[in-house]
């Protein structure tokens, strides 16, 4: 887990993606690492992986949220443990 405040510079660069809790974060990271574009496209089209919105980033900042993260350069995949 990592505090959102430590991920803000990645967000500012446009490289943070939020992974829906229906998906396993490590499996999603593996598919990115394998460059499995067909699987990633399916997840993107189903909104299971999305860019972190400004509203979500602001909420995580205000809540001092701690998130699960998986780095697959240049991407940082994030899940918020509910």
Model-derived features with residue positions:
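N-terminal, charge-rich interaction modules
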Residues: 1-34
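A general structural signal for well-ordered secondary-structure junctions
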Residues: 13-17, 37, 49-50, 66
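Generic secondary-structure boundary/loop-capping signal
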Residues: 14-16, 41, 74
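Generic secondary-structure microfeatures
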Residues: 21-23, 44-48, 74-76
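Short, hydrophobic/π-rich interface segment
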Residues: 27-59
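Short, compact, well-ordered microdomains
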Residues: 50-82
């Amino acid at each position: 887990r990592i505090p959102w405040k430590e991920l803000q510079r990645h967000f500012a660069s446009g490289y943070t993606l939020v992974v829906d809790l229906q998906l396993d974060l490590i499996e999603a990271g593996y598919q990115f690492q394998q460059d499995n574009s067909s699987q990633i496209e399916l997840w993107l089209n189903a909104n299971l992986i999305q860019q972190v919105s400004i509203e979500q980033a602001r909420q995580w900042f205000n809540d001092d949220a701690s998130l699960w993260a998986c780095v697959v350069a240049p991407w940082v995949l994030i899940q918020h443990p509910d």
